């Protein structure tokens, strides 16, 4: 029987801390759909202040937060949004911007670092004079950090250049900042500088920050007022959400300072894995709390076989594809867990790569 468990599937797997549970039990609450929950107001005001925006809104999930933002900016059905071909909104959010929002996605290739070529973004913007034949571009979306690129960070300079393109063409800029605080810590830049160019931002509370539930979207006061209506339409209006927001307020105080340690542990794990025969990790690309580990070409191993072997020792992982495993560090992973994980990997690699005896 496995006694030790090291859950590296995602930073969404964390359990509420004792301080969070206490805050949730004692949270001051009211009906948030009617706009009276005081703890929700505290969280929204704090997030708006941190992001340098006028207002904020608690939403049940990052997927809903992104969908609401796209629908507010693209309020004419058939509008077009420009976004990366490997971004979360396009790949992992069930096509909601199209099926629910009536918004047409136009993809631009994501580079290895999560950026999109600036010239390609500008070239993708439709000429309004041709709107009889194709959709009107109303929005550009960025993702920071970029999950499918391994948690890579978009710089202030890059984001501002995209913002300049958006303004030049009269379109809006939305940032999917599910792990925005990770980018802030990694780059050593306050979050408000990372999103200054954006008209709206979605920030997840249950990923790096480790709260149990929810996301927040921020933007102008008029944007948030429209977002409230869309949230209600999508079924995202909830009553006494102060119970959830109380945990998020604790997360901002308790876990935000821990993100730098998550990044150090991710780098430590990546460096150790990269020294093992049969495994390849681009250590330089490990900028935050995420690691992509690939099986070397010609290896007898598959990601799924390795994942199952490690699971027997309590190491929980998600397979990216047949030759890739994704690893995500969070605040409940200790340095001891990292060393234990490396020892389990080392043992698995030795036993699984041994030639079969006939």
From Swiss-Prot:
Expressed in root tips, seedlings, carpels and seeds. Gene3D superfamilies: Aspartate Aminotransferase, domain 1, Type I PLP-dependent aspartate aminotransferase-like (Major domain). Pathway: Amino-acid degradation; L-threonine degradation via aldolase pathway; acetaldehyde and glycine from L-threonine: step 1/1. SUPFAM superfamilies: PLP-dependent transferases. Disruption phenotype: No visible phenotype under normal growth conditions, but mutant plants have 50-fold increase in seed Thr content and 2-fold decrease in seedling Gly content. Keywords: Lyase, Pyridoxal phosphate. GO terms for biological process: threonine catabolic process. The modification N6-(pyridoxal phosphate)lysine is found at residue 207. It catalyses: L-threonine = acetaldehyde + glycine; L-allo-threonine = acetaldehyde + glycine. Changing residue 114 to R: In tha1-1; loss of function; 50-fold increase in seed Thr content and 2-fold decrease in seedling Gly content. GO terms for molecular function: L-allo-threonine aldolase activity; threonine aldolase activity. Its cofactor is pyridoxal 5'-phosphate. Its EC number is 4.1.2.48. Signal peptide: none annotated. Belongs to the threonine aldolase family. Threonine aldolase involved in threonine degradation to glycine. May play a role in the removal of L-allo-threonine. This is Low-specificity L-threonine aldolase 1. The lineage of its organism: Eukaryota, Viridiplantae, Streptophyta, Embryophyta, Tracheophyta.
């Amino acid at each position: 029987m496995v006694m030790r468990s090291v859950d590296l599937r995602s930073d969404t797997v964390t359990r509420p801390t004792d301080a969070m549970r206490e805050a949730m039990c004692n949270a001051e609450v009211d009906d948030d759909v009617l706009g009276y929950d005081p703890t929700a107001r505290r969280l929204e005001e704090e997030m708006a202040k941190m992001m340098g925006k006028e207002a904020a809104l608690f939403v049940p999930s990052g997927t809903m937060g992104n969908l609401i933002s796209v629908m507010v900016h693209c309020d004419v059905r058939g509008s077009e949004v420009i976004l990366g071909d490997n971004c979360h909104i396009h790949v992992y959010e069930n096509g909601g911007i199209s099926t629910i929002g009536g918004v047409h996605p136009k993809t631009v290739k994501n580079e290895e670092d999560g950026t999109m070529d600036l010239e390609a973004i500008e070239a993708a913007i439709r000429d309004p004079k041709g709107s009889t034949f194709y959709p009107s571009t109303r929005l550009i979306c960025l993702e920071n950090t970029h999950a499918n690129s391994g948690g890579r960070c978009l710089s202030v300079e890059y984001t501002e250049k995209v913002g300049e393109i958006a303004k030049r063409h009269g379109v809006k800029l939305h940032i999917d900042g599910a792990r925005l605080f990770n980018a802030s810590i990694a780059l050593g830049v306050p979050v408000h500088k990372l999103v200054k160019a954006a008209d709206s931002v979605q920030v997840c509370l249950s990923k790096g920050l480790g709260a149990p539930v929810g996301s927040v979207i921020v933007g102008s006061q008029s944007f948030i007022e429209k977002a409230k209506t869309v949230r209600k339409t999508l079924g995202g209006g909830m009553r006494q959400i102060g119970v959830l927001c109380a945990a998020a307020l604790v997360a901002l105080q308790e876990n935000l300072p821990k993100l730098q340690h998550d990044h150090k542990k991710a780098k430590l794990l990546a460096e150790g894995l990269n020294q093992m025969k049969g495994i390849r990790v681009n250590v330089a690309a490990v900028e935050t709390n995420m690691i992509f580990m690939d099986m070397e070409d010609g290896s007898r191993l598959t990601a799924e076989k390795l994942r199952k072997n490690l699971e027997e020792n309590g190491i929980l992982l998600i397979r990216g594809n047949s030759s890739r495993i994704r690893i995500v560090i969070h605040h409940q992973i200790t340095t001891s867990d990292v060393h234990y994980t490396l020892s389990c990997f080392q043992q698995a690699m030795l036993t699984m790569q041994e030639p079969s005896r006939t």
